[in-house]
């Protein structure tokens, strides 16, 4: 049951991991998972929520691993950025098939494939009810897609960054390794840093903290969780300035 008649957020930045798209597969994109995510995003659009999306690329390529094997880190990160573009194109296609207008913007120019990232264009598209998928990370090596999510969230003045994960939120310990780990409902930025909780990498997290961008971590694999988060229901873990 929905507690609020209208959404708690007007504009969100949804961060999806590349791994989330692979479903039970070990690699690539599971079409069923992609279509389910597109349907969940469609629900938000129909509620009048403006949706920006950042997708990782870990299902297709991980630059850090090859860097350890000797590949130049910059080259590896460039390849990772291209992986996020591939995921973005797949998501746009799934949204179009669900009759949702969507646009892919890339932080690196890819003429004929997708649009270049432009802040003013992105704001206009969001206001017109289109989903904007921000791909290629920040366009710079050494920055994660979590950093890109926080950066784009701040730029588009989103109400919140929603980090979709495979667990129900932020726990006292790894819930997979420790079944007794407890879920936090709310945390402050300071508590996350003091407790050394792994929400996202430090560069991304401090960017959000410095700009007072709230972060909510939730389980995208739980049907309806995204809608419940946006409707302001108790779901996942909220991180902001005053827990």
From Swiss-Prot:
Coiled coil: none annotated. UMP binds at residues 57, 77, 138-145. GO terms for biological process: 'de novo' CTP biosynthetic process; UDP biosynthetic process. Pfam families: AA_kinase (PF00696). Its EC number is 2.7.4.22. Its main location: cytoplasm. Keywords: Allosteric enzyme, ATP-binding, Cytoplasm, Kinase, Nucleotide-binding, Pyrimidine biosynthesis, Transferase. Pathway: Pyrimidine metabolism; CTP biosynthesis via de novo pathway; UDP from UMP (UMPK route): step 1/1. ATP binds at residues 15-18, 58, 62, 165, 171, 174. Residues 23-28 are annotated as: Involved in allosteric activation by GTP. Gene3D superfamilies: Acetylglutamate kinase-like. It is an enzyme of class 2 (transferase). It catalyses: UMP + ATP = UDP + ADP. It comes from the Bacteria. It is found in: Cytoplasm. One of its GO terms (cellular component) is cytosol. Allosterically activated by GTP. Inhibited by UTP. GO terms for molecular function: ATP binding; UMP kinase activity. Belongs to the UMP kinase family. Catalyzes the reversible phosphorylation of UMP to UDP. NCBIfam families: pyrH_bact. Homohexamer. This is Uridylate kinase. It comes from Vibrio campbellii (strain ATCC BAA-1116). The lineage of its organism: Bacteria, Pseudomonadati, Pseudomonadota, Gammaproteobacteria, Vibrionales.
